[in-house]
Amino acid sequence: MRGEIISVGTELLLGQILNTNAKYLSEKLALLGIDIYFHTNVGDNEERLKECLNIAFNRSDLIITTGGLGPTVDDITKETVASFLGLPLVENLEAKEEIIRFFEKIGQTPTMNNFKQAFFPEGAKILPNKNGTAPGCIIEKDNKIIIILPGPPSELIPMFEEYVYHYLKSKTNETIKSRVIKIFGLGESKVEEMVRPLLFNSNPTVAPLVGDGYVILRITAKGHDDKEISEMIEDMESRIRGIIGDYIYAVDEEEMEEVVVKLLQKNKLTLAVSESCTGGLLAKKITDVSGASKVFNLGVVSYSNEAKENILGVRKSTLESYGAVSYETAKEMAENVRKLANADFGLSTTGIAGPTGGTPEKPVGLVYVGFATNEEVYVKKLMLSGDRSKIRTRTVLHALDIVRRYLLGIKID
């Protein structure tokens, strides 16, 4: 089934509201095996909305509209769809009573314009709105399906999940499932080169995407049987792992910090961190993970040289000879925070995140990450690109990946 989404609302075109509905609907429809080929945003204008509907009718089997169902004069979606289809608007008494009950619950009397929300194109299947006053509806005409949904996500999502999902599932006999493989330490072009033969596979498909400092390979399989689909995905994941190897750090929703915390918990080991350029972001990422208190002993943000010297015990001679952004300082920061916290591991970050502070010898993007155990210290020098936020985020990923690799017995690049 070919589908498209028409999002109605001038506020979307002005950039006043982020269109999260289209993202949500596309994800849900993909799970039903419905291919979404087009997203259209259109303002609250009858003629332009009719143009969009005319185009959609000529290329799609399923058209979903969002927004424009409220009580005001610029809420024109149902009226425009009805006119486009040549259908009269008829009042639904049950929907009208629901509107009255909604206002009674909040101790108010509905104004007359609210009752326009109880009118629908003739023959439409009504979709109750348990979270607002604007019901949706489904219209089947000329072998096409039009589904009209409210704009607020707090109303659209429950309506879709309770009514629309099951309706569409009965209309389709295919299911789509996806799995996301997360890769760190290789660029997108390198990953694409390594898996290029797999990118031409038709079912399942493999698509490379760029995350925030990492690369994603999305496996998508389509079929009629859940077991068959799962087996296709498992087989493709196995092939990808055979090519990419230890650069794969997580699958689906799992993040790098979750992987590291789980490994620390499994091995009953503890970690302490000392941060300069990342400003506490490393500690935040770790402590965002439930159960991190069992493995995370201490976090120190030592932004100034005085803090590095007085709190962490970095030698004054080190700072004077090599500077705060140096191999030697990162090494001492990692060693000393481990001892200070009585932890198994110490992890440190020091660098120049920019946009100012760089020099020809030490440019913006220069970062050192230190990792100390009770037997050895490893320091990784990085040259990162991007703005301040990206440099900090990527530094954190590199730091966590060092811990991941050490705990898994993988060579630290």
Curated annotation (Swiss-Prot):
InterPro entries: CinA (IPR050101), CinA-like_C (IPR036653), CinA_C (IPR008136), CinA_KH (IPR041424), Competence-induced_CinA (IPR008135), MoaB/Mog-like_dom_sf (IPR036425), MoaB/Mog_dom (IPR001453). Belongs to the CinA family. This is Putative competence-damage inducible protein. The lineage of its organism: Bacteria, Bacillati, Bacillota, Clostridia, Thermoanaerobacterales. The gene is cinA.
